[in-house]
Amino acid sequence: MRKTVFAILTALSLIAAVAPSSLAGPKKSRKAAKTEAPAPPKKTPYQKFSTKKGIKVAGEGLKVYRDGKKVWLEVPDSLMGSKIVLSTVVDKSSSEWVPVGKSVSPQKVFVLSRTDSMLVLQEPGAIISVKDTTMQAALGKAGLLPVRYAFPLKYRNGDTTAVVVDATRLFSPSNKDAFSLKGVNIDDTFSAWDEGTPVADFSEIIAPVAYPRSVGVRQAVSFHVSPYLPAGGGRAYVFEGQKERIDGEFITTVTLLPECGITIRETDRHIGVRNVPFKEYSSEKGIRSGRTARRWNISKDKRLTVYVDTLFPEAWYQAIRKGIEAWNPAFEEIGITRAIDVRRYPSYGGFRAEDPLVSKVMADDDGRREEIRTALFGDNSTGELLSFTMTIPAGFIDNVRYEAFYNIADADARYRTYDMPESALCEIVRARVMQAFGGVLGLEPNYAGSQAYSPAQLRSPSFTKVHGITASVTDDVLFNIFAREGDRERGLVTIVDRIGPYDRLAIKWLYSSFPEGTDEKKALTSVIAPYTGAEYRYVPVSGKTYMDVRALPGDLGNDPEACFDERVRHLRAVMENAYSWIGDEDLEMSSFRILLPERIALQFFAASRTLCYNIGGVYNDDSGMRAVPKDFQKHILRKVNDFYTTFSLPPSATDLFHFSGAVSSFDGLFRTNYANQSGFFGRVRMVAFAADKAASGYPASEYLDDLTDLLTANIRKGQVCKEDEFPVSLLMAMGLMSNSPMMQHSYQEAFHRSNGLIDSFPEDEALAPVLSGIPVTSLSDLDGDCYNAMERIRSILEKALRAEGDPNKIGILEYLLTIAQAALGMK
């Protein structure tokens, strides 16, 4: 019994001891569970933003986000003070006139900075060169840059090392800093007058994009633009009420610019280079403005790599490569070997041809564009070039066929066929790429290069084997027009095949480096000083005035008359033989054959226009301004007039060389248009300028007398039998008016009085006065000279009218007389 009670008490005590802990155990474990698995922390605003459904991001460090219709930028604090460039290029286009790869933005450069609440984009302004520490300190205190954009800070990233802002307006198609279609071709006639207005509801952000130093967005945009036509003299016809639509996909990026790798290289008038402005500050001399050359950071340690589109066949690739690398010898002369390296597009997946910092040569399937185009990308605030895009359109081949056919086919049989041999075609590709690449390197065209050598030298195989055919490939010359049949076989160079002596000098000046502490300006002057021959001459092109006749388009050799004769010889040979050369039935209705007569006619006009630049021509260099001799000016006027008025079509050319319309014959077309197309009226102002500033001894009044004698010769003789000669008198009257504001005003008044009974003054580009580079003070007497010439024309027309008996011709003469009287203010 006692044992039983003891056992029961022992069991109860054990239960009492164990029960509290067993009952409390689950509560404690539940509390412990809550402690071990706490509620997840709330997301930060940045985390909510960056993980939002549907948001897309691209880039590392510098990032871009697409959030529906918004674009956000994430900018690390470490980039503050860095420079970026905002740019847009065409990626796809509905118009063949807006090519892929074309830049459609002004490439604005900005400096990144930040306040407590804003991300700021500042304009860097002009390059500043500071000559002493005193000015450096002063500018450091006063150097506040103008603000272009300010974006409120919206988020900080996870480790607070970057800020995020809503940058939608920066990438917006409405932002003129990002998009500008001004000047873009709408078709083969019209161009865009304005920057373009995005079409509502036709814009879409497709995706964010990123490259090693760039981020941005690809977007589909439709623009409305106002078309315009150039009208000469800086004027234009703008059709503001009419809107043309351009659709496309565009890539807009901000690119982080590297640290500037070049120094200021102030321009020199003896070397033509692309340039940007700079300001120099000195406590002794104050502020001075200048221009510094645009150039690449090319040195012994840094090369320029160029990638070529894989769409080009192998033969074209080799021609492109050789054309670009033809510039390497100029760099080797200053100690830089293989400065330019050309490669095919790499096959590895990381290569992106659309990267703004990739230099490339692209194929373009645009069949209507004919010229190679280049676009430079760089830091416009320092002048450093960072990349380029060269585009070769499909239409380039057709242009090559025409150029070769009418320039040299009679001398080189390879070009007498539509389907020329690939080797001949690639010679031209190489030459044209070599020419275009001079501009890529920062050189301006030097049209004086083609005038460095004499016709005798250009006919010499031994000379051309050593020197080529031009002193600068930046000139527009392509073929040696002095070549005759068989010359190529005996070793004469017939096409541009190497850079010239001026080109080598220009590269030496532009890319030479000097030890630290060198007075660079003096060193560069000494680089140029030894080179004084004609082959080193640089003459800038000054618009359509051509202020120095040694820098003209379409010329070759230092004898302008011989150049004209050779161009005409080639053209006549083509006309005589074209039918047999391209008589294949498959070409019967081809565009090549149909357009050939028009192309040939335009080449005749281009040849005479180049020669006529010597009328009123001057030589303008370090020794001052000198005029082309008066006798030679008069001789050129007579020569061109006689050529066109006596021109007759070769009998073998009659089946091919004819036109449809009012003037169907080739010689009729010439008589109707030669005075206008040769530039007789456009040279009036330069004749006046040369007489005033270069003492030519050939005043405008005398030139107008000579011109009137030539153009009214048949009417003065009573021979008004060819109706296609009447427009010459009409153009004479209009040409005089284009150089006389007084007569223009009188004519317009008469037009309004007659309620349109006579034609309004035509805004013809070829007749419009070209004012660029000609001081108005030089033309003070020109109005009176033109008025007196019009009086003489009126008198000639009145005399012809009294002698004419044909009623139809009387009506034409009366019409011409009405125009002259209206211009003279006669009622």
Question: What annotation goes with each model-predicted range?
Answer:
Residues 1-8:
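Bacterial N-terminal signal peptides that target proteins for export
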Residues 449-827:
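Conserved catalytic/binding loops enriched for acidic/polar residues
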Residues 16-26:
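Boundary at the C-terminal end of the N-terminal hydrophobic targeting segment
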Residues 345-367, 427-484:
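The catalytic-center signature of Zn2+-dependent metalloproteases
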Residues 291, 315-322, 326, 424, ...:
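Generic recognition of stable, solvent-exposed alpha-helical segments in well-folded globular domains
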Residues 325-336, 438-439, 443, 479, ...:
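Sec-exported extracytoplasmic/periplasmic mature domains
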Residues 28-312, 318-321, 330, 334, ...:
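Auxiliary tRNA-acceptor-end handling modules of aminoacyl-tRNA synthetases
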Residues 9-17:
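Bacterial N-terminal signal peptides
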